[in-house]
């Protein structure tokens, strides 16, 4: 796996699933391929994205700044600086300075990542802030190692939270989660179907599924009524793809 592929993987792991994630993935691909060279426009686009947490925006802003060539005098962005200040905790800043000194001596991506993984997410964010604000300089490989270590810590905590929801025994939470997943799957089907004539059937299935979820929420239904709803939709989507000549593994 190449360095930039690894960075893209880690960064996308902390972005919530949805149309915005696909947009961000495309922006990262363009940046890493050298196709997007307007850092100012890129940062303005990032600043106005909804849903993303300030820290996620800060990390993405840091990645873009490291990767896109820019004029030396280009202004640093406040939304990135605020996100990478370690919540203003002086302890985070102290640890960040210690980490920075270690990273300065490290020139490899994996070496920097290993060192950074022993620090808290707050200290890691503060260290990124030091580098972003030009208070310190490390190799690009070391900076990417720092970014990936931060993303790994964030993704770990998100995974624990996600697992707690998946294994919850509360039937109401499970019911709502199944309906949310079915609704987002239907939306994705509508987007993938496009405007071809063959797409009408897939669009109809997706539309009916969304109407069903709305009705279930409106009238209140038994928690078991949503079982298998998302899987039924995915089977329909796969059947549609087969007819269109697209062979894909099932993504349950």
UniProtKB/Swiss-Prot annotation:
Q: Identify the HAMAP family for this entry.
A: INFV_M1 (MF_04068)
Question: Do you know which Pfam families this protein is assigned to?
Answer: Flu_M1, Flu_M1_C
Alphabetically sorted, this entry's keywords are:
Host nucleus, Membrane, RNA-binding, Viral matrix protein, Virion
Q: Tell where it localizes.
A: Virion membrane; Host nucleus
Q: Name one GO cellular component term.
A: host cell nucleus
Q: Where is this motif: Nuclear localization signal?
A: 101-105
Give the note. Answer: Most abundant protein in virion. When expressed alone can form virus-like particles in transfected cells.
Question: Source species, please?
Answer: Influenza A virus (strain A/Chile/1/1983 H1N1)
Assembly and partners are described as:
Homodimer and homomultimer. Interacts with NEP. Binds ribonucleocapsid by both interacting with genomic RNA and NP protein. May interact with HA and NA. Cannot bind NP without genomic RNA.
User: Topology in the membrane?
Assistant: Peripheral membrane protein
Q: What does this protein's UniProt record list under function?
A: Plays critical roles in virus replication, from virus entry and uncoating to assembly and budding of the virus particle. M1 binding to ribonucleocapsids (RNPs) in nucleus seems to inhibit viral transcription. Interaction of viral NEP with M1-RNP is thought to promote nuclear export of the complex, which is targeted to the virion assembly site at the apical plasma membrane in polarized epithelial cells. Interactions with NA and HA may bring M1, a non-raft-associated protein, into lipid rafts. Forms a continuous shell on the inner side of the lipid bilayer in virion, where it binds the RNP. Determines the virion's shape: spherical or filamentous. Clinical isolates of influenza are characterized by the presence of significant proportion of filamentous virions, whereas after multiple passage on eggs or cell culture, virions have only spherical morphology. Filamentous virions are thought to be important to infect neighboring cells, and spherical virions more suited to spread through aerosol between hosts organisms.
Return the annotated region ranges for RNP-binding. 165-252
Question: Can you name this protein?
Answer: Matrix protein 1
- Biological process according to GO: viral budding from plasma membrane
This protein's gene is called: M
Family stated for the protein in its record: Belongs to the influenza viruses Matrix protein M1 family.
Provide the primary localization: virion
**InterPro entries recorded for this chain?**
Flu_matrix_M1, Flu_matrix_M1_C, Flu_matrix_M1_N, Flu_matrix_M1_N_sub1, Flu_matrix_M1_N_sub2, INFV_M1
Query: Gene3D superfamilies, per this entry?
Result: 1.10.10.180, 1.20.91.10
Q: Which GO terms describe its molecular function?
A: RNA binding; structural constituent of virion
Q: Where is this region: Membrane-binding?
A: 1-164
């Amino acid at each position: 796996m190449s360095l930039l592929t690894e960075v893209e993987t880690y960064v996308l792991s902390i972005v919530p699933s949805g149309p915005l994630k696909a947009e961000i993935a495309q922006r990262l691909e363009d940046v890493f391929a050298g196709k997007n060279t307007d850092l100012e426009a890129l940062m303005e686009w990032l600043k106005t994205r909804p849903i993303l947490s300030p820290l996620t925006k800060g990390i993405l802003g840091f990645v873009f700044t490291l990767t896109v060539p820019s004029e030396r005098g280009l202004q640093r962005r406040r939304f990135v600086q605020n996100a990478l200040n370690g919540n203003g905790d002086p302890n985070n800043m102290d640890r960040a300075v210690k980490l920075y000194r270690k990273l300065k001596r490290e020139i490899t991506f994996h070496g920097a990542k290993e060192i950074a993984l022993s620090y808290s997410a707050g200290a890691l964010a503060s260290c990124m802030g030091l580098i972003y604000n030009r208070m310190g300089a490390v190799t690009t490989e070391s900076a990417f190692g720092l970014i990936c270590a931060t993303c790994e810590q964030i993704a770990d905590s998100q995974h624990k939270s996600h697992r707690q929801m998946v294994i919850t025994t509360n039937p109401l939470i499970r019911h709502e989660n199944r309906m949310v997943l079915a609704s987002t799957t239907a939306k994705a089907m509508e987007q993938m179907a496009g405007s071809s004539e063959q797409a009408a059937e897939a669009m109809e299935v997706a539309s009916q599924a969304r109407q069903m979820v709305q009705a279930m929420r409106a009238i209140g239904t038994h928690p078991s009524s949503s079982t298998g709803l998302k899987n039924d939709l995915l089977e329909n989507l796969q059947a549609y793809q087969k007819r269109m000549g697209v062979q894909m593994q099932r993504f349950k």
